[in-house]
């Protein structure tokens, strides 16, 4: 993890570090790993069971993504995207990374994670049959 983080430009690195701290605080027990140049958070060791990701961008911001974000309550309208499930929040500063509304989104998705992942596994199993 440290090797990945230290390779980032300083501003993006600071934002990414803060987002990792916020994610760890709000997703106790989540597995954290690097996958496709992003920090992933999962309920298992499989990257296919990811719930969230932190993706540093070259343009100076960091995306905090939610694989099941379309179903999350978002009263502060932080989530961006129009896909079937995926949503993300663009974070431009360490202060934005500390936003309590973002922490609530992270905690909510983690609370729902087992049910969401079980649903995906059921669909995959059905499609293989």
List PLM regions with ranges.
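Charge-dense, helix-prone N-terminal extensions
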Residues: 1-129
